[in-house]
């Protein structure tokens, strides 16, 4: 049995979409238990595998992260993180304030001993539909080569256990594919990744080929990763807007859109973040999943499923054994 703690109050459309996702999750997974934290006046479910705990406070999206974690002790997010810290839950899921959740993960759940810097990881879509694991996308703006090596080790485990890839290809994001390309960080990181025998290092990868499906794990520093992630998100939205404007531009185009509707739906689903769940803060002593703030019920359900798989696969235990315990 896997037990997941969930912040009922975080996200743009909470608690409605959270409750819908939780209800579907406990019905789909008979070996899943939920501890739900939130306002009892908005709790509407009744299920033997859902334990509800009332919280008198909520962390808002505009709250300063560290201050909110320290001052709002009875908030749904803080109480959720404490459940993981205390061993009551295997992992947690929230669609709330990203900075606050990262702070809760770092200061309440805590790092795995030996992990210097936790990394925020997402799974992004590719044109072949398989997707790739991308980290760090914003946990740490500054990174040393040793940090990128740990990201590669963590990402490799994540790709194996969460995505089911037997021997993941691990690549380093750079401005060229040649080993000598890049700045001091990427050059030194390249050598460290190349020398490590615990994963399948496939060399450098350029940003222009990320979506082609040539690799399984891409490693970079949080500053670069966050910019790349936002660029991909923005480009996808712009393409969607342009397609919509094109197909609605004339009667002929509207008819073409009807003919292509099935193909367009397939493309949209392939590129939809909801299919991949949330982002995960790797390197913590418990699974912490950040669902997108604008998640619908399907996306939040995917994030719960992601946390459950992490619990089933004992991913934190594996990271503790293989990456943790080393000198920082």
From Swiss-Prot:
EC number: 2.3.1.274
GO MF, one example: phosphate:acyl-[acyl carrier protein] acyltransferase activity
Catalytic activity: a fatty acyl-[ACP] + phosphate = an acyl phosphate + holo-[ACP]
Record SUPFAM superfamilies: Isocitrate/Isopropylmalate dehydrogenase-like (SSF53659)
Keywords: Cytoplasm, Lipid biosynthesis, Lipid metabolism, Phospholipid biosynthesis, Phospholipid metabolism, Transferase
GO BP, one annotated term: fatty acid biosynthetic process
Record keyword Isomerase present: no
Subcellular location as annotated: Cytoplasm
InterPro entries (UniProt xref): FA_synthesis, Phospholipid_synth_PlsX-like
Description of how the protein assembles with itself and partners: Homodimer. Probably interacts with PlsY.
Family according to the record: Belongs to the PlsX family.
Protein name: Phosphate acyltransferase
Gene: plsX
């Amino acid at each position: 049995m896997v037990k997941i703690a969930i912040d009922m109050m975080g996200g743009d459309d909470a608690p409605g979409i959270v409750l819908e996702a939780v209800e579907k999750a406990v019905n789909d997974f008979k070996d899943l238990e939920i501890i739900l934290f939130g306002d009892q006046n908005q709790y509407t479910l009744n299920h033997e595998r859902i334990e509800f705990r009332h919280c008198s406070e909520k962390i808002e999206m505009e709250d300063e992260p560290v201050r909110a974690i320290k001052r709002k002790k009875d908030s749904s997010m803080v109480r959720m993180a404490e459940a993981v810290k205390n061993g009551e839950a295997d992992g947690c899921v929230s669609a709330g304030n990203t900075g606050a959740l990262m702070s809760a993960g770092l200061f309440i759940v805590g790092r795995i001993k030996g992990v210097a810097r936790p990394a925020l990881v997402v799974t992004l879509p590719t044109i072949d539909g398989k997707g790739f694991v991308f980290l760090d996308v914003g946990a740490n703006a500054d990174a040393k080569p040793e940090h990128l090596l740990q990201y590669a080790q963590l990402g490799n485990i994540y790709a194996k256990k969460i995505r089911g890839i037997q021997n993941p290809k691990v690549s380093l994001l750079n401005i060229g594919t040649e080993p000598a390309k890049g700045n001091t960080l990427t050059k030194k990181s390249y050598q460290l990744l190349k020398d490590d025998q615990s994963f399948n290092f496939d060399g450098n990868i350029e940003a222009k080929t990320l979506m082609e499906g040539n690799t399984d794990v891409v490693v970079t520093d949080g500053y670069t990763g966050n910019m790349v992630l936002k660029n991909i998100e923005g480009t996808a939205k712009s393409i969607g807007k342009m397609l919509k404007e094109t197909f609605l531009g004339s009667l002929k185009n509207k008819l073409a859109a009807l003919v292509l509707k099935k193909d367009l739906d397939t493309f949209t689903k392939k590129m939809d973040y909801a299919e991949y769940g949330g982002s995960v803060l790797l390197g913590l002593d418990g699974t912490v999943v950040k669902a997108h703030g604008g998640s619908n019920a399907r996306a939040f359900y995917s994030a719960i499923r992601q946390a459950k798989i992490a619990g089933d696969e004992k991913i934190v235990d594996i990271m503790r054994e293989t990456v943790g315990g080393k000198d920082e």
